[in-house]
Amino acid sequence: MSRRGTAEEKTAKSDPIYRNRLVNMLVNRILKHGKKSLAYQIIYRAVKKIQQKTETNPLSVLRQAIRGVTPDIAVKARRVGGSTHQVPIEIGSTQGKALAIRWLLGASRKRPGRNMAFKLSSELVDAAKGSGDAIRKKEETHKMAXANRAFAHFR
């Protein structure tokens, strides 16, 4: 039994312009080589492009996209008796959001296009509509969990 106390859960800070935690989470995930100002530029350009495309509040589109991509359940590899089973586990809200953001950014990086802001805005709009690679990834994960329901007791 460890004598150390449990680490306190950090609350996500909000970004300077929109005062939104989701935007800040996106910025921190898109960050490469410590270039945070470039990450902010990419996100803010993507938000402007969303505003131009949909003519609605871009933050609501962002929220809707992340809510649509957030998985409820995932599979985790568990070794039992010499064989590895994919065990379905429920995911908490913060972990689900983190996964959703990771999938959205991965899908937007794979997209063909000019720059990251354009690709990210396209992926977010598609995810808000219920299509796109990130949504497909969520459905794939849910299918895997449903297929491996028999191993749920290995948790």
Curated annotation (Swiss-Prot):
SUPFAM superfamilies: Ribosomal protein S7. GO terms for biological process: translation. GO terms for cellular component: chloroplast; small ribosomal subunit. One of the primary rRNA binding proteins, it binds directly to 16S rRNA where it nucleates assembly of the head domain of the 30S subunit. Keywords: Chloroplast, Plastid, Ribonucleoprotein, Ribosomal protein, RNA-binding, rRNA-binding. Part of the 30S ribosomal subunit. Pfam families: Ribosomal_S7. Its main location: plastid. PANTHER family: RIBOSOMAL PROTEIN S7. GO terms for molecular function: rRNA binding; structural constituent of ribosome. Belongs to the universal ribosomal protein uS7 family. It is found in: Plastid, Chloroplast. Coiled coil: none annotated. This is Small ribosomal subunit protein uS7c.
